From Swiss-Prot:
This is Small ribosomal subunit protein bS20. Belongs to the bacterial ribosomal protein bS20 family. Pfam families: Ribosomal_S20p. The lineage of its organism: Bacteria, Pseudomonadati, Chlorobiota, Chlorobiia, Chlorobiales. It comes from Chlorobium limicola (strain DSM 245 / NBRC 103803 / 6330). Binds directly to 16S ribosomal RNA.
């Protein structure tokens, strides 16, 4: 336990930030899983495109605001784009 008042405040702030970060990363994880489920289920191209756009938008936002590293955001976007572009070609 913190001994100083300022340390207690920093602990409270840290817990709030940690909860926010976890929530944002969880949202991203859910979006990525939803897109993968749609691809696996061979869903309509428009549904997959909507999932792709929302996932890329979330990745951009998290990368810019440094919730995830910019290179990780770029790598994930590249992987998603490759999945999306190849969707429907293998049929």
């Amino acid at each position: 336990m913190p001994l100083h008042k300022s340390a207690e405040k920093r602990l409270r702030q840290s817990e709030r930030k940690n909860a926010r970060n976890r929530a944002r990363k969880k949202e991203l994880k859910v979006l990525l899983k939803n897109m993968q489920k749609l691809i696996d289920a061979r869903a309509d191209k428009s549904e997959v495109e909507a999932a792709y756009r929302s996932a890329v938008q979330k990745l951009d936002r998290l990368g810019v605001k440094r919730y995830i590293h910019a290179n990780k955001a770029s790598r994930k976007k590249s992987q998603l784009t490759r999945l999306f572009n190849n969707y429907g070609k293998a049929e």
